[in-house]
From Swiss-Prot:
Major place of residence: membrane
Quaternary context: The Tat system comprises two distinct complexes: a TatABC complex, containing multiple copies of TatA, TatB and TatC subunits, and a separate TatA complex, containing only TatA subunits. Substrates initially bind to the TatABC complex, which probably triggers association of the separate TatA complex to form the active translocon.
Protein name: Sec-independent protein translocase protein TatA
Localization, UniProt: Cell inner membrane
Family of the protein in this entry: Belongs to the TatA/E family.
Length: 83
């Protein structure tokens, strides 16, 4: 028994019929197209994750710069009040 009650011989017969109907060149082309689509999808997902990470880093830098500016302003204010 193979997958779900289908024997290996039944799978081989189906494979032979598919090869006869479509031919090896067309199946090879379909396989290549499918592989290219999967590769493109993975690339798009990784690009999206990279863009999110860059946005988070930019936000962190912005917050750090704002905090530094606020600290500097507070320091200058204290110096002015001390005089």
């Amino acid at each position: 028994m193979g997958l779900g009650g289908i024997s290996i011989w039944q799978l081989l017969i189906v494979l032979v019929i598919v090869l006869l109907l479509f031919g090896t060149k067309r199946l090879k082309g379909l396989g290549g197209d499918l592989g290219g689509a999967i590769k493109g999808f993975k690339k798009a997902m990784s690009d999206d994750e990279a863009a999110k990470q860059e946005a988070e880093e930019a936000e962190q830098k912005k917050v750090a710069a704002e905090e530094a500016a606020a600290a500097k302003t507070a320091e200058q204010k204290e110096k002015t009040e001390a005089k």
